[in-house]
C-alpha cells in the first residue's frame, strides 16, 4: 500500500503543479508585444526540455536498469546466463555480452525516439486531412495546429504517466523520485508553453483552460492506470524491457515533433519571416525574441544540471 500512496501523492502533486504553471500566462494580462515574447520563451522551453531533460533522463533510465539488473542477479546465475548466450551466439570474448547489451540499448533509444516522432507525424496528418475539407484552408491549418499541439503534448504527458507508473511498479523510491522530478521539470514549462502558444493562436480563455486541464490530467491518470492495471508478472516483464526509459524516450519523440514542427515555425512566422530573395518582410525574430528563445532553451538545461548535482 506504501507504493500506491506514494504514486497517488506524486500524481496529485503533478496535476496541481502542472495546472498552476499553465495558469500563469492566463492570470497575467500581457500586451501584444509581451505575449509574443512569452510565446517565444515557451517555445524555447519546449525545445530545451525535450533535448536537455527528457532524452538524457530516458537514456539514463535505460542504462541504469541494465546495470542494476547485472548487479542484482547472483554471480553464478549471471555467469550461467552469459555462457549460455555465448554458446548460442558463438561469442568467445568476455566483453561480447556487454557489447551486445549496449547495442540492444542503442537500438531501444533510436527506435523509441523515432516511433514517438512518427506517431505524432501520423496523428498530425490524419488531423489535417479532416481539417482540409474546410472552405478556408488557412483557418483549417491554424485549427489543426492548435489541436495537434495540444494532442501532441497530451500524448507526451500520457507517456510520462506510463513512465511514472512503470517506475512506481519497480518499488524503488529513488527511481520514482527521479522520474517524478524529470517529469515535473518539463511538464511545468510545457504547460506554460502550451497556454502561451494557444493564447497567441487566439483561442478563448475558457477553451484554453479545458486544453490545459486535459494536459494536466493526462500524466497522473495514466500513471495510476498503469500502476493499478499491471499484474506482478507484467511488472517484471516491463522491467525486463526497460519500460520506464522506453516510455520517456517515446514521449521525447512526440515532444520533439510538437516543438520543432508546430511551435517553432509558428513562432518564427510571427516576425513575418520570408524566404524569398528580395522579400522585404524577412525580418524573422527580433534580437530580444531570439534572446528569449535561447533563454527558454537554456532554462531546462540549467535546471537539469542542478537536479543532477
From Swiss-Prot:
Transmembrane intervals: 7-27, 35-55, 107-127, 147-167, 177-197, 211-231, 245-265, 285-305
Pfam families in alphabetical order: Zip
Molecular function terms from GO: androgen binding; G protein-coupled receptor activity; zinc efflux transmembrane transporter activity; zinc ion transmembrane transporter activity
InterPro entries, A to Z: ZIP, ZIP9
GO cellular component: mitochondrial membrane; mitochondrion; nucleus; perinuclear region of cytoplasm; plasma membrane; trans-Golgi network
Descriptive protein name: Zinc transporter ZIP9
Deletion consequences: Homozygous Knockout females fish for SLC39A9 show significant reductions in fecundity, embryo viability, and growth of their offspring. Furthermore, a high proportion of eggs fail to undergo normal chorion elevation during activation.
PANTHER family tied to this protein: SOLUTE CARRIER FAMILY 39 ZINC TRANSPORTER , MEMBER 9-RELATED, ZINC TRANSPORTER ZIP9
Job of this protein: Has dual functions as a membrane-bound androgen receptor and as an androgen-dependent zinc transporter both of which are mediated through G protein activation and are required for the androgen-dependent apoptotic response. Upon androgen binding, mediates apoptosis by directly activating a stimulatory G protein that leads to increased cAMP levels and MAP kinase activity and which is accompanied by increased intracellular free zinc levels. May play a role in the proper zinc modulation during egg activation.
UniProt GO BP: bicellular tight junction assembly; egg activation; intracellular zinc ion homeostasis; regulation of cellular response to testosterone stimulus; regulation of vascular endothelial cell proliferation; zinc ion transmembrane transport; zinc ion transport
Catalytic activity annotation: Zn(2+)(in) = Zn(2+)(out)
Keyword Iron: no
Membrane topology: Multi-pass membrane protein
Family designation: Belongs to the ZIP transporter (TC 2.A.5) family.
Keyword terms: Cell membrane, Cytoplasm, Glycoprotein, Golgi apparatus, Ion transport, Membrane, Mitochondrion, Nucleus, Transmembrane, Transmembrane helix, Transport, Zinc, Zinc transport
Compartments (UniProt record): Cell membrane; Cytoplasm, Perinuclear region; Golgi apparatus, trans-Golgi network membrane; Mitochondrion
Major site of localization recorded for this protein: membrane
Glycan attachment residues as annotated in the record: 29, 242
